[in-house]
Amino acid sequence: MEGFEQYIEALISLHSGLERQGPGDPGFSEFIIEQLPQLPQNPRIADIGCGAGAGALILARKFHSRIRAVDFSKVFLDQMMRRAAQEGLQDLIEPIECDMGKLDWQPGSIDLLWSEGAAYNISFEGALKTWRPLLAANGVAVISEMNYFSNKVPDVVAKYMKHAYPGIKTESENNDLINSSGFRVLAVHRLPSIAWWDNYYDPLRDNIAALKDTGDDVMQAVINDTEEEMNLFRAYQDDYGYSYYIMCAV
């Protein structure tokens, strides 16, 4: 457990200061918001696995409603609130440091649940089952999940995912999973691969350059894993990536 905790601490340090802790794009997020069905006035919103707040800030600007922003890392939450203060949005965002799989909120208390690149931490299936009771009647969820884009997966990708993300499924399998978990899929949109590079991997490279070869074995292991991930995506970005699932509670 100690080794795992050290690895996570190094992972947080590597991503500290970045606008995003995973692939995404503000323009794409705004596009997704435009696809949502009509929400109640002043919707109750949660961003689960918010990281440094890239999504929460967009949601606050768009809806002018209070956002419950959940993450396990105080480092990222503090970074989010500094950015929120710079934009005058601090009163709209409530930072919540906790385990996303153990939210003790009232059932039916969320109108829009938003989660980008975080559900895998408790498995996509686990996230659907855990978060479904939180949604109000006809509540809407937007959850992004890394998945295969077809049933034909290159062997090198399948081998990598066996240890990196053994729970990965195809887009079609995730659609079926959503529809059998108390939701109905409204739309699915794939995050363009350029969003991985422009908004995540390229900025991350600067942090890697600053922290590489510092003599910290744990950090070096994190960097090695991250560079392996980058190299795989560069070669096989047409075969897998993030899909944004828009769904409603049924």
What are the functions of these language-model segments?
Residues 46, 52-102:
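Class I SAM-dependent methyltransferase SAM/SAH-binding core
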Residues 101-112:
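A short acidic, Gly/Pro-enriched loop at the edge of an enzyme's catalytic core
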Residues 112-125:
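A short SAM/SAH-binding and catalytic strip from SAM-dependent methyltransferases
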Residues 189-250:
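Conserved Class I S-adenosyl-L-methionine
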